[in-house]
A protein has these predicted regions:
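Phosphate-binding/switch region of NTP-binding enzymes
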Residues: 14, 18, 35, 61, ...
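Aromatic/hydrophobic pocket-lining residues that form π-stacking "cages" and hydrophobic walls in ligand
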Residues: 45, 133, 173
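Conserved inter-motif catalytic segment of the P-loop NTP-binding fold
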Residues: 54-159
Length: 205
């Protein structure tokens, strides 16, 4: 009975009603045009998983680990714990006070992990990422793996082999998800820029 299977709820009732949440052993592809909030939504999923008692792991190829953590901190803090400030140019900025950060860090401790994408050379990053994911899943029991995004997780240039390499990478993620019974969320950008797109326009699909 699929309704009895364990899963991670997204926290969005309308979405959970349609997809049933994030099931363990599956890879969920998250796509959309640039600037539509894919990375923000992924960080929301991580906070939801943590709130449900699951350990999480994230890779961001576009943000350094400390920038990604700051992004995640704002999701974890929520609007009631975010302060406003005015910078020297008169613009309103947002910040999280140190006491709130300390509480968030304590909440993360032993349960939230971010990949340091400066730890190895680009040519080793793909295999290094997959190896790190498998190690952290085995050692600390991570149940949600988030990768943002498919292109930056790979070292393959634009060539005839690009889509084959993407498919191979996704296949490895799928095997990892099944082997360790974890949920994987993979952010992928559309191949083309247009008003609408199909599955064939999504890298790795």
């Amino acid at each position: 009975d699929i309704y009895k299977l364990p899963r991670i709820w997204t926290g969005i009732p309308e979405l959970d009603k349609v997809i049933g949440g994030l099931f363990f052993g599956q890879v969920t592809l998250l796509t959309g045009k640039r600037g539509e909030g894919k990375s923000t939504f992924m960080s929301q999923l991580m906070v939801e998983a943590l709130d449900q008692g699951y350990a999480v792991f994230a890779y961001s190829g576009e943000l350094s680990d400390y920038h990604f953590k700051r992004w995640l901190d704002f999701q974890a803090a929520g609007p009631d714990n975010i302060a406003t400030n005015t910078n020297v140019y008169g613009d309103e900025t947002y910040l999280i006070t140190n006491p709130v950060i300390e509480k968030i860090n304590a909440w993360y401790r032993g349960r939230a992990y971010i990949y340091d994408n400066g730890a190895m050379d680009m040519e080793d990053e793909l295999e290094g990422l997959l190896e790190t994911v498998e190690n952290v899943v085995r050692r600390v029991g991570v149940k949600l793996v988030c990768i943002d995004n498919l292109m930056t997780a790979m070292d393959v240039g634009i060539s005839d082999n690009l889509y084959q390499a993407q498919s191979a990478f996704v296949h490895k993620l799928k095997r990892l998800a099944v082997k360790h019974d974890v949920a994987v969320v993979l952010v992928a950008h559309p191949r083309k820029t247009k008003d609408s797109f199909t599955n064939d326009d999504v890298s790795g699909s």
